[in-house]
Amino acid sequence: MSTPIQKILFGSPGTGKSHRIDQKIIPNVLKIDIGRTPQNIIKTVFHPEYTYGDFIGKLMPITRSGKVEYNFYEGHFLRALAQAYKNIISSYDHKENKIEDTDIENVVLIIDEINRGNSAAIFGSVFQLLDRDDSGWSSYYISINEIEFIKILELIGVEFSYDSHGKVDKYELKPHGSVKLKTFQEKLSFLNFDLINRTIKIPPNLSIVATMNTSDSSIYYMDSAFKRRWEWEFIDIDSKSICFEGIAFKSRPDWEGFIEKLNAFIKSNHKSIRGIEDKQVGYYFIKGDEIKKSCIQNKLMFFLWDSVFNRDKKPLVSLLYGDKNKEHELITFGDFAQQVDTFIEKIKSF
């Protein structure tokens, strides 16, 4: 199990974003063997008619023997989440009551053309799960309804016994026997979900990778809060990823000092910013004791480019080059992303 990826690859059409996911991220970074474990790769495409029901799950009518019945069909996210839980269960050492992290297979949910659907409506409350802690689990949990929770349990292999009122009475997941709810909760405590209150978290072995064509950015608006939950990787027109290696800040105090100066820079350019109150950056915008250059580039610099200075890039031009007449040097985010080292040094000395 590797560190989870939560990233949107973006760039012009035809730059090889999907190819990069299939040929590099899935086999090399996530170590998923598509030939051996195809169930660990779940793909979908967002479009204007794609809904929360397609993503999470929905009740659909079917006719059997002349009678109409309703079945709940899981969506792409629920299927990916259940598969990730299932892989954790299969790596759980029931004798020593511990997880063997190195044995847990990764799962990836791939969303093509994420901005062609109404992302905020499609994700719904799942948006809350996109915040991850240092362990890779969601920082917060959400509650889901009984039908959705039962479907997750079915997908991971749980069998149910029902009482005379049609309510679930006992749960069975091999090698455990059939047990009551409280006992079953204790047996599955390592999955970080609450059977009684029906709460879930995204586990660290579930990555979400999406693609977005910049030419389609106006199809559906993606709000800043949604964008901040992702890393952004720009794919240039030559199909190369602009991603710098190395550590930018080796400690939290260094990072926090940098953020204070960055906010001073942002406030000094308030005339170029609409709604400056929510355009400043908090200390936990990027988490971890060490801050990588790639995170500065793909998350922080993208936020500045796309959300803070989206109306006017002159403050960034002035910061990097000291001359506002060099606007031609900073046309695309790719141009800005190339300047990660210069950007860091300029903010440090601001």
Feature map (PLM): residue ranges:
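C-terminal regulatory/interaction module of P-loop NTP-utilizing enzymes
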Residues: 1-350
